Amino acid sequence: MPTLIADEVSRYLESLIPARPPEVQAMEVYGREHDFPIIGPVVGHLCYQMARMIGAHRIFEMGSGFGYSTAFFARAVAENGGGVVHHVVWDDALSTQARTHLNALGLGAVVEYHVGEAIAVLQSEDGPFDLIFNDIDKHAYPASLAAIEAKLRSGGVLIVDNMLWSGRIFDTGDSSPNTAGVREMTRLLTSSPLWTTSVIPIRDGVVVAVRR
């Protein structure tokens, strides 16, 4: 994936975060070898930090992959005294793979697994949640916001990945559905009085927004 962040900066930021457990490092190797996108250790550490800062006990992930991001959230929830992280993917095999990794990390007890479309699963679950993480198909970002607003508590945190979209958001000739979805989600979150929003330029850009 092309990146807007200089390799030197990325290496420096990664050097500052704690070492990950061997199982998490193995997940990183798998992501590289299979070209499977993961949030990476720097964004993962940010997710862990945000969850710890707000004392999150109930977290909902929209688009969890094979459990890499879930590992950071689940560790935070466990250290916060317990709760649940909802892992949501569209594929049984990914759900099984995530379960294997998270059990190996000793975090399976705080994870609930769902196979289905993320917005529909969120709508079906009882809120409120302390933190929602959104990494679904980018064209669906704007459509997800109503469900997020209905399920996230006041003072809760929304984290959205890929919000710089490898620079495609700056290409005036790119009107593809995914690029348009990232642009519109950014507009919605930065213009709504319901949200206090920052775009953090690490990896592929991460939005951190607090619901008022």
Describe each region flagged by the PLM.
Residues 1-24:
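N-terminal auxiliary segments of SAM/dcSAM-dependent transferases
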Residues 30-34, 169-172:
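Short glycine/proline- and acidic residue-enriched helix-loop micro-motifs
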Residues 9, 29-33, 130:
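A short, mixed-charge helix-start or loop-turn motif at secondary-structure junctions
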Residues 24-30, 165:
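Short, basic/glycine-rich phosphate-binding loops at helix/coil junctions
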